[in-house]
């Protein structure tokens, strides 16, 4: 079995445990308590995701350059309980916006059915904006209908996420 298949197998095991949960602030807290960076699940999945990015089989499609890449590793199917599995690499170094936080923003989008997002920092101090604030190693869980920029600061990280029915929409304009 190759690493990609091993990763998808681990994700299926994880999804079997969360398939009936709806993304929201309570689930975000629950994920961080039960599947946070000290958990075996987080450690095994994050190690394979980091390997995948380094080896070029995960987050390998450039969006706006090598600092912002994405790839879907698995489409929604019965085996994944109809969740898709996607990896996004974002690096704020050298690409910061001229704002107080010095962040890098990806493409504005919406989550019709929510998102379960494992945050995997590659640089010490790298964090991703989430519904409950800045998140280092751990989880964010934007609720169904949420819209946001994926936003990172303090370096590189991987957002490794699970979308119910694979639903994500880029057909929205940012508010304000």
Curated annotation (Swiss-Prot):
Species this chain originates from: Pseudomonas putida
Transmembrane annotation, as ranges: none
EC numbers: 4.3.3.-
Family according to the record: Belongs to the PnbB family.
Catalytic activity: 4-hydroxylaminobenzoate + H2O + H(+) = 3,4-dihydroxybenzoate + NH4(+)
Protein name: 4-hydroxylaminobenzoate lyase
Keywords: Lyase
Superkingdom of origin: Bacteria
Molecular function GO terms recorded: ammonia-lyase activity
Job description of the protein: Lyase involved in the degradation of nitroaromatic compounds. Catalyzes the conversion of 4-hydroxylaminobenzoate to 3,4-dihydroxybenzoate (protocatechuate). Required for the catabolism of 4-nitrotoluene.
A UniProt-annotated Pfam family: PnbB
């Amino acid at each position: 079995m190759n690493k990609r298949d091993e990763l998808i197998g681990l994700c299926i095991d994880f999804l079997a445990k969360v398939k009936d949960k709806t993304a929201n602030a309570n689930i975000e807290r629950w994920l961080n308590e039960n599947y946070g960076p000290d958990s075996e699940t987080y450690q095994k999945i994050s190690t394979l995701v980091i390997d995948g990015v380094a080896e070029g089989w995960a987050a390998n499609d450039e969006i706006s350059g090598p600092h912002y890449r994405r790839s879907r590793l698995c489409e929604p199917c019965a085996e994944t309980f109809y969740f898709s599995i996607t990896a996004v690499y974002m690096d704020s170094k050298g690409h910061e916006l001229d704002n107080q936080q010095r962040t890098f923003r990806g493409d504005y989008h919406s989550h019709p059915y929510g998102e379960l997002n494992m945050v995997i920092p590659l640089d010490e101090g790298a964090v991703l904006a989430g519904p409950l604030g800045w998140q280092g190693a751990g989880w964010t869980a934007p609720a169904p209908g949420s819209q946001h920029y994926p936003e990172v600061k303090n370096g590189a990280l991987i957002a490794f996420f699970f979308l119910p029915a694979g639903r994500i929409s880029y057909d929205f304009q940012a508010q304000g």
